[in-house]
C-alpha cells in the first residue's frame, strides 16, 4: 500500500503500486439530471476496500470522468478517499491541452490524491516530442506522483516506447497503466525497470504479470475482486498454473464486460446485483438488462 499517499514527492524510495486497483464506477441517480449518487459511491468503495485491493482510481474511463463537472470530480475524489479509509486513491485527469489540464490537476491536488493518472492529450494527436513536453510539464508541477496512461484507442495518440523510456527518467513519473496493445512495447518498458507497469486491458492481466508487470487497473476488478487479487498473489509466488486457471475462469466474464462500451455492461451487472442504478450520462447509453443478466449468470459460474 502507498505510504503517506497525499504528501509531496520525497527523495526516498518510490511507493509501490503493486496489486489490483479498482477504477471505481461513478453511480448516477435515476433522476432528471442523472445526479451523482455519492451515497452509492461510498458504499461501493467501502465494499471493495475489504477485498484485498491495493487502492482505487477515481474519475478514470470507467468512472465516466468526461461526463462530470470539475466540482463533481472533486466531490467524487473526496467521497472515494473517505470511503477508502486509508487505502490510496489515484485521480484521473485528462484533456486536450496543457493549460486547462494543468489547472485542473493543481485544483484536484488540494483534495489529496495519492497520484494522478494522466493519458496523452486526446483528439489533437500530438507528436511524440509534444507528448514528452506535456507530461514533463505536468510531472514538474504535480505535488504527487504521476502515472502515465497509454490508451490510444480512446485518445487517438499512442505513446511510443522511446517516449515512455524518456519519460521514465523523470523523478515524479512512477508508472504506467498500459492499454497500448503492443506487447513488445510493454516488455521493453518492463525490462527497463524504471516504470511500474500496470495492466489496463482486462484480458491481458495474466500475461502482463508473467512478463513482470506489478499489477492492474481494470474495470473487471469490480467483479470477483478476490480472484483478481489472488491471481496477482499466485504470480508473485510463482504458482503460475493457479494464476492461469484463474485467468481462464474469468475470461468469459471479461468478454461480456466489454460486449458493449465500458462501463455500460459493468453498470448493468452492478444494477442487477442491486449496487447501483443502470444509469449512464449521455452520450453513453445503458447496456441492456439482458446483458446484465448474462453477466450475473457468467459470474455465478466462476
Regions found by a protein language model. Give the residues of each.
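A general structural signal for well-ordered alpha-helical segments in protein cores
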Residues: 41, 73, 77, 101, ...
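Basic, gly/Ser/Thr/Pro-rich low-complexity segments located predominantly at protein N termini
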Residues: 24, 65-68, 97, 180, ...
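Short glycine-rich loop/turn motifs that provide flexible caps or phosphate-binding loops at active sites
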Residues: 18, 54, 59-62, 91-94, ...
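Catalytic alpha/beta core domains of metabolic enzymes, predominantly
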Residues: 140-141, 152-258
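C-terminal alpha-helical cap/extension of soluble enzyme domains
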Residues: 2-3, 8-10, 16-29, 47, ...
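Alpha-helix N-capping/helix-start residues
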Residues: 38, 70, 161, 237-240, ...
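Active-site beta->alpha loop and helix N-cap motifs at the rims of alpha/beta catalytic domains
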Residues: 2, 11-30, 34-156, 166
